[in-house]
Amino acid sequence: MASDNGSNIMASIDEMMYSVGVETLHPGGLEKTMEMAEACKIIHGSKVLDIGNGKGFTAIRLAQKYGCTVVGVDMSKAMTDYAKMSAETKGLSQQINFMNIDAHQLPFGDNTFDVVFAECSTVLMDKEKAFKEFVRVTKSGGYVADLEMCWRKPPDRKTVDRAFEIWEGFSTMTFEEWRDFFAEMGLTEIRLNDFSDKLRNMTTLYIKALGVMGILKISWRMLKNKSLRKAMLEYDKFFNNNKEYIGYGYFVGRKE
């Protein structure tokens, strides 16, 4: 089991990033999110399931751009409540429904959604159990898509253990293993997009996402909060020390 210190590292950083207006917390940002959406052929009227919806930014973007309907699911009630308020504020509450449920046991019938869309969530889940549910609720001819941190090559045990500690329960695979996993789940026409080079300098990515005002706000919060400052340093240290292993990419597969 992860230590309290380790398990709180990402929670502290995520909360801080959201508080200063960062909408997507993965390298590649909104660009890769929407690129993955295009690969899923989302159109007006599509029915999309957003796994681990967080504060609802992806679901809202998809609904706004495509005119699709979205159901978002998340284990966090706080995130679910925030997402609901965001959708209501933007006049999208009739188009988007956020639910506080476990994605391992989806309360939807078979063949319900045109697209099942996940970002940075299944690495914290029982992947086989979760994907069986994702595929089950996807319509024939529909798509399952997932954007995750992946191993560029098999890591050593120390790296695996530290990743598990930082992201409590974290478990990922190499790009090749992810592609094989999609195939094992019965998906075809599997598309892989490896954008690991986006990770070359995490500090630069943060600066670009935050902007001047965001940087000032975060600097002030870190000056006042020693534990938050420590968490940020631990996170940055892990990425900088393991660049040879850490990658990011997305996978899209079609259900026959």
Residue locations for each model-derived region?
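Short, glycine-/aromatic-enriched active-site segment of Class I SAM-dependent methyltransferases
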Residues: 149-169
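A short acidic, Gly/Pro-enriched loop at the edge of an enzyme's catalytic core
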Residues: 104-115
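A short glycine-rich, Lys/Arg-flanked "PGG" loop and its adjoining helix->strand segment in the class I
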Residues: 128-143
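Short alpha-helix
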Residues: 171-186
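Conserved Class I S-adenosyl-L-methionine
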Residues: 193-256
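Class I SAM-dependent methyltransferase SAM/SAH-binding core
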Residues: 49-51, 55-105
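A short SAM/SAH-binding and catalytic strip from SAM-dependent methyltransferases
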Residues: 115-126
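Conserved alpha-helix/loop element of class I SAM-dependent methyltransferases that forms part
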Residues: 26-44
